[in-house]
Swiss-Prot record:
Gene that encodes it: helA
The name this protein goes by in its record: Protein HelA
Annotated GO MF terms: monoatomic cation transmembrane transporter activity; xenobiotic transmembrane transporter activity
Entries under InterPro entries matching the protein: AcrB_DN_DC_subdom (IPR027463), Acrflvin-R (IPR001036), CusA-like (IPR004763)
Recorded topology in the membrane: Multi-pass membrane protein
Amino acid sequence: MLEKIIRFSLKHRWFVLLFTLVIAILGVYNFQRLPIDAVPDITNVQVQINTQASGYSPFEVEQRITFPIELAMSGLPSLDYTRSLSRYGLSQVTVVFKDGTNIYFARQLINERLQEVKDKLPPGVETTLGPISTGLGEIFMYTVTNKPNVPISQHYNPTELRTIQDWIIKPQLRNVEGVAEVNTIGGYEKQFHITPDPSKLVRYRLSLNDVVEALERNNANVGAGYIETNGEQNLIRVPGQVQNMADIENIVIASFEGTPVRIRDVAEVALGKELRTGAATENSKEVVLGTVFILMGENSRTVSERVAAKMKDINKTLPEGVEAITVYNRTTLVNATINTVKNNLLEGALLVCVILFLFLGNIRAALITAMVIPLSMLLTITGMVENQISANLMSLGALDFGLIVDGAVIIVENCIKHLAEQQHALHRVLNLEERLKVISYATTEVIRPSIFGVFIITVVYLPILTLTGVEGKMFLPMAQTVIIALLASMLFALTFVPAAVAIFLRGHLQEKENWLVHYLSLGYAKVLRRCFHARRVVISAAVALVVVSLGIAFHLGGEFIPSLDEGDIAMHAMRIPGTSLTQAITMQDLVEKRIRQFSEVKNVFAKLGTAEVATDPMPPNVADTFIILKSRKKWTNPKKTKPGLVQEIESAVQQIPGNNYEFTQPIQMRFNELISGVRSDVAVKVFGDDMDTLLKTAEAISAQLKQVPGAADVKVEQVSGLPLLTVEINRDVLARYGLQIGTVQEAVVIATGGKKGGELFEGDKRFDIVVRLPESLRSDPNVLRQIFIPLPLSKDGEQHFIPLSEVASLIRSESPNQISRENGKRRVVVTANVRNRDLSSFVSEAKKRIDGQVKLPSGYWITWGGQFEQLQSAYQRLQIVVPITLLGIFLLLFISFGKVRDALLVFTGIPLALTGGVFALWLRGIPLSISAGVGFIALSGVAVLNGLVMITFINKLREQKKVYLKDAVLQGSLARLRPVLMTALVASLGFVPMALATGTGSEVQRPLATVVIGGIISSTFLTLLVLPGLYYVFHGRRKKGQSKSEPQEQIM
């Protein structure tokens, strides 16, 4: 089959070149369609169920809303687990499905279950589903603010800015292709407030509810069918909707002593502010912040660019003096990451080409070999587009051009050798027919081991396809891309390379060693003889190195995946529970002023509390602060590191009392939270029933965690300390007055929280009309006690009132700030970040300390979460994958040689290669990670290539030329020096830029590249120095029947 392909490629060589050109053009076309991102989206399939329940305490939210919804979600197909959050007035249940579940199918299932549970929820409570987005969903953020050169007198107030955002900017952005949602926080939603005067209401014998009912009865348009007159149909409408504030003021509530009482007689009508749950700040001033969420499955770079382009158009339509400023754009990170990958690949390709020129000694031959790189990449891009693989840090992170050209190198090198030998034998330049025949023979001679080597590397990556969860989403694209690239290189090695050699390698050819190969050969011959004669010592030393590396590996420590340096900082600021939103904004202003003193900081903005869509519900006392940094080139001290800057910022803001902080990065923060429900590297989850016991146990665990070296930002989840003002109604007194509890509740709700009585339309815009007491009265507890409660009408039809204090008392108390649950069980989380230490050793030490020092009450237990949870899952999976990979390699080697002995000989390249990888990590101070683990998997395939080539050649010498064992070993080793060095150098140098890069995203690629480079170096030494001796030892015994006089050694 392979021979037929080669003969076809040579016979129709110009067609092959034309076909190659078509593939290249297709690749260029697909490059325009290739989705580009920073990293793969590793978020699990999840749906958020948000329920607003105004006035409900966390206990009531948990009991009446969260628990019924959790119960309804039980038993859903493909359900993984549920977790929930119950806060004052808000329930959020997150339903996590198994990987591969269709998000639209999952949402359909949840909607069906919500319909079933609807009747069990409190009246008036409605559930909504979160946007169809992921942890990487927040791709674009912008602030709506006044232009800096506009006089303060002409500034738009926060309510007007919010109106511009809600009715001008947001609708246009939601129409951008690929946008799932535009979330808003900050400013105030515009409302029309009717603020009654309690004394006037009493004077006219009216209640607060009378005002609401009057508004509801006088603010509607109705249709009354139609009539037919003279053969014409006339529709009948009865408009009654209010058009402006004057219409509201003129609404008649009732008649008092024969005179109509209008709303204007008992209340003021004016523009008002909503009772908001969140705010936004930028550089110590309040702003309106919009966040664009990408639709799941869309490409973030493309959608970000569309949003940015649309934002430019929108800015042209905004009112004079207002602008929307981009404060966060994912494209910046994507471009920086892709630039790092691009530079690594280009530098790697350049290094590979240099090695090809040096070793092949023929410009045309080197160019033919080098052409396989861009051709394979273009075909790989086509494969990525067809398989919906985005180009990102991980998918392109393991591409090694050295491996891609390996097959082509072997073929071209063998063709040059045979062409030169044939020309030398005939003493003339070969004609076309002779050249094609030699090229066909030379290619066929090495194509099987060459293809087999590529096949081994491909098989090595196949087990990575079995990874699941976060590690699967991270490394699956990498394995798929490498496999596609290797298959592409195999195709071009079979077709393009022989055709190109036949066309371009004409004229007189000489296979001569250049100066580099000549001197390397001389030096290698001397070292080889010494190592061969001291082979047992050399083999023993190699075994000792393997043993030492095992000891080092156990002390390297471990982490899940090296954190991608996103370039910016996310700071989670927490104040005392119960801190008002107004006070939190004041404290946030101080924090931002302190942060802006650092010259490295470009911009600071923050989200406080919960936004319009509760994708990330936070209480008012908590703020997510985004610190956007300048380019590293613009830092006053370029030597300063980002961790160093974080420590300086932390020291500065810690001086502001009443705040606690934890530092992370924007994407990392959302990933951690959405995947495991926490925002930190490590989480200790304490499960149980009683909140006080949970909190006490969590505090004890926190105290122990703080003593572990490397612990930072250790804190217990804020679950207590929410101040409540409870209106405790006396049922006995209520009964004496003949009142219903609902009457009292309604009066309090309208007075303090306000009640919507209708809407006022301004063109396409619509705004709520709300009835509540004036701000100066509703915030005063003493006034609250004096709220008038309407009594049932007396016998003479008179309306009388009593103050609230007659039937109820106000009681101050504390409530849980929030109640978190996981799989239906309450939990409290202790979180910590790990700095200047690897994750694995930190958790190991923390576990020992907690197990020894903290006694858990009966019925309570702990689990470890955060990134450590993902690390453990990945390690368990790799414990299965790695042995299967090694077994697969051995079976392939056995199939190749047909002998266990030779298969074992080549297989020995893997332990010493892994040794080099471990030493390389140890020398660079890099802990073991899933990235390094994938590097070891890839290395195990690369490690056997050189051994495969050398053993195959030595066996060939012994079988075909009947060379004695020692001569065969030494001659075969020397003859294979150039291909072994070329393979090793091109494979390792292709990874050098990744190992040394410092750009955005380089930290993720560094462990993998370091492992491969270190492993290839040690594997090359094994192949050149240890393997010859091993071969002699393995094959040195005389076979039965062999003559004793037959020489076993011959002087070289």
